[in-house]
Amino acid sequence: MIEKITSHTFGGLFKNKSIQNFIFLITIQASNIVITLISMPLLIQSIGVDGFGLVNLSLSVIILANIMVGFGYNLSGPREVALHQNDKEMLSHIVSNIVFSKVLMALLATLGIVVAIFGLNMFREYQWILLFSVLLLFSEATLPIWFFQGLEKMKLISIANVFSKLLYLLGIVLFIHTPDQSKWVNFIMGAAGLGINMLLLLYIHYELEIKFYKPKFIQLFASLKENGLLFLSNIATHISVNGGLIVLSFFASAATLGMFSLAERISMVLRVFPSMVILSIYPNATKLLKDDLRKFVVFLRKAYFGSLVVSLFVSLLTFALAPYIIQLLSKTNLAESVTYLRMLAFVPLFACLNVANVVIFLARDQKELMFRSSWILLLYMLPVCFGLSYFYGGIGLSYGLLSTELMVLIICTILNFQKNGDVLKAFWMNINSV
């Protein structure tokens, strides 16, 4: 009997599409991290520390611009695909609208960067590196990860991502040898990604029989307008999650910034976990909520408490191993970094507490609630983190970032009870039946 239960449990676990989605999303993130770790010493050796810094600075600008290119479609796209995955005509219009809209935003972002460089003479130290980096905007625009998320078929996109990163690594080895070739680093990354993405779009067209229509301008405008709140929400969330180091830079020394930055980077890698949970389960959650509230509640409850258990384990493990992790990465004993990491180790756990709220927002397509919660959070995070950083430095900022995760839980729970009381009450009332 026990063998039968165990076999059923583990067999069902790995056959579950949401679990597969999660595994493949983690594979994508892991491959990105591994390739970054491999490429860093190669680039530093080839283009020097200064060139490496300018390449990363350009990449930071592109990452911010990619928020505009994504325009919230990475959140809304999977939902639309999940709801219409059996209607190829509807899918064709969804894919066409999203791809063309993102390409349009990439063109506008590129125009903005060109004007900033040649019209306003900004980014003086790395203008040409940044200009050659704009290909990454079109790589982002054509990446159909949202489509495969909605279909809950992530295997192909994860393999394609690994292959594009290997092409990038090969390009670095073959073509980047001197500091004056710095401008080609991000260009190679963008070209590899864009090339693989075009092959994926061809696969979608020919193998999955999805047609590409040329949308009318009014359709593109309507699509962008519909996603405007998600775009603004993403901006606020990005600042709230990633703005801590900038806040600390106003009050701390370079040494403190360096030690906090090391701990924060580790924390940010761990914080990917709750995001991956949300992205992997919400396409199926959307379909379940539309068809059967009871099944939705059971599914969400399992995912929610499962993610809490995993994140608790990861946080406690990181807390215990903090001295060894810092020693491994810095090659020296940085007691201050260890203190920061032990505090920030609980950021992913606190973030996981809000998974259920966010999934409900996304499943019900409540962009306004996402917008309100993210901007209320930003209005909380900035003064609190500024104040705590001013009085207590890195320790204060760590407390501020932890409180930010708890505050967003409170904000989203209140909004959920106001707008989705039926779903939230069903979720909590059914806990005892697990």
Feature names for model-found ranges:
Residues 16-74, 169, 229-255, 382, ...:
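Signature of the first transmembrane helix
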Residues 2-18, 182-186, 195-241, 284-298, ...:
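Interhelical loop/hinge segments that connect adjacent transmembrane helices in multipass membrane
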Residues 20-36, 157, 163-168, 183-204, ...:
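Transmembrane helical elements of multi-pass membrane transporters/channels
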Residues 15, 127, 137-160, 346-375:
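Membrane-interface junctions at transmembrane-helix termini in multi-pass inner-membrane proteins
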